Every structure is written in structure tokens, then in C-alpha cells.
Amino acid sequence: NFRQLHSILQGHPDCKKVPGVDASTGSLGQGCSIAVGMALGAKVQGKDTKVFTLLGDGECQEGQIWEALMSAAHYKLDNLTVIVDNNGLQIDGSNEEVMSLGDMPAKLRVFGFDLHEIDGHDLDAIEAALGAPVTPGRPKAILAHTVKGKGVSFMEGQVGWHGKAPNEEQRQQALKELED
């Protein structure tokens, strides 16, 4: 089903098909802005609601992301958690080659986020970061250091697998390698 038209995992999340996805977005950073709006709306309405958004480090080259992050801190959205998949790669190459993000942890801290840096492949670390106490008045950022395609020999660290679906033989090999 991955990367096939009309499937639940056709590419970018489709809120009409994927349970738990509240907005259909692409790779242009809209998700963070939508999440900020949802978190702010919940605050204004007095709702005890937590909002989570997942970003790729490559999309953090979009200006809209930084405007959303500034707004989250400005409005003291302590009901917002931003998770950044920090794998260093995007569709066109490495982030360093395309446009360096510089010191991402420092940027998130300066923007007013309560930052948790983790190994994004460590489920215990993910659970601990998600469950860490909220700092009143500060949004939370989880910078998850990952390797694209981790655990699959022909995918690991390879830009070409950004949005490509494996054929049946590759799928079987990937599943075997992940099980081992």
C-alpha cells in the first residue's frame, strides 16, 4: 500500500484516510503551523488538550516552520509537542548540502522550547521524552536523532529512499533484516 494511489499510505498524510491525522499536509511545513493553531485554539477555549506534530529536519528549511515555532513560544503553548525527525537527509540530498540548519538544538532553545534530544531509534528514550513533565508556559521539542532507513542494508542512509516504495523482493529483504 505504501506510495500507491488511493491507499492509506499513498504519500503525504490524508486526514480522510489515516486515523488520528487531523489535517492533510505536504512537505512544506504546514503541519507545524496547523499544530500551533490547534494548540492556541485549545488554550483560548480552555480545553485540556495536548497537540503533537512531527516534522522532518529537511522541511525545517521552510520559513513557515520558524514562524510557527516563534508563535508557539510567544503564546506559551505548553500543550504543544514538536517532534523533529533529525536524520540529516531530504529528497535532494543531505541537509548540509542543500541548506544547513546550523545548530538546531540551540535554535529551538533560543526560540523558547523545552528541548529533549534523544536517540530516535530508542523506544524507551521516545517514551521518556513524551512523558517528561511539561515546563509551564513552554512548548516541548523532541529532537530525535535518527538514521533514514535504519536496519535495512540497502536503504540505510540513502537519499534515494526518501519517497520510494520497495518492490516485492526488496520488501521481503527489508522485513527479514528488520526481524533479525
Residue spans for each PLM region:
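Short coil/turn segments at beta-strand junctions that form active-site/ligand-binding loops
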Residues: 47-50, 78, 137-139
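Glycine/aspartate-rich loop-and-adjacent alpha/beta segment that forms the canonical ThDP
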Residues: 123, 128-180
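Short, conserved beta-strand edge motifs with alternating hydrophobic and charged residues
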Residues: 51-55, 81-85, 117-118, 143
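A short alpha/beta connector and helix-capping loop motif
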Residues: 62-87, 141-144
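Histidine/lysine/aspartate-rich catalytic loop segments that bind and position anionic ligands
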Residues: 75-101, 105-108
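Short acidic, glycine/serine/threonine-rich loops at helix termini
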Residues: 14, 64-66, 92-96, 152-157
